[in-house]
Amino acid sequence: MDLAEQMLAAAGRKATRLGLTNVSFRTGDVTSLPFDSNSFDAVTSRFCLMFLPEIPKAATEIARVLKPGSWVAAAVWSAPEKNPSIGLSMAAIKQVIDLPPPDPTAPGIFRLAKPGELAGIFQQAGLVDVTDQEFLAEWSYASAEEYYTSLMEIAAPVQNLMAKLSDAQKQDVKQRITQAASNYRRGDRIVFPMAIRIAAGRKPL
């Protein structure tokens, strides 16, 4: 479920590539889930919650639809300095157009990067056995061009900013992004370090 049609389309294409047939995709708002209470064995969220204006309301809705004893796990981005692939693209855009300083309390990529923040929201929603851990990994791409293509497909905040640019500005940003990405070449691939936080909690019996 997602509010963004392009994200659902990307998920659908990936499911097709993987040959998955037991999955469905639908547009919806996590702060008002169209499902009965106590109806899900598990809920997962992948890089979604930090973009919501009402995160506590979303957590309460997730807790509502979970069956007693069932779990939710949500992945969000960790600190920006640990995720250069994201900062790289935003820096390139800022070199082309003026952007206002980000509001740390507003919805955004790193809104839930602070350790324990999402865990606290889950606890307030009534979940128990709540955990919050940071995981380190890598993103690997065949080329800087592949990284750029992937970025334009899945990074909604970048997509929204790029949509406001002229064709010449878009080309300028693309060149800046691919040049900066080339600094992360390892052998014949582009490899970025990444860090995510995963918070999980269980609905009480």
Predicted regions and their residues:
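Class I SAM-dependent methyltransferase SAM/SAH-binding core
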Residues: 1-36, 42, 56-60
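Conserved Class I S-adenosyl-L-methionine
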Residues: 13, 30, 106-205
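Short, hinge-like loop/turn segments at secondary-structure boundaries
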Residues: 16-19, 41-42, 90-92, 148-151
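Short SAM/SAH-binding signature in class I
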Residues: 39-47, 73, 196-199
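A short SAM/SAH-binding and catalytic strip from SAM-dependent methyltransferases
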Residues: 41-56, 78-80
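Conserved catalytic/acceptor-binding region of the Class I
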Residues: 56-57, 67-142
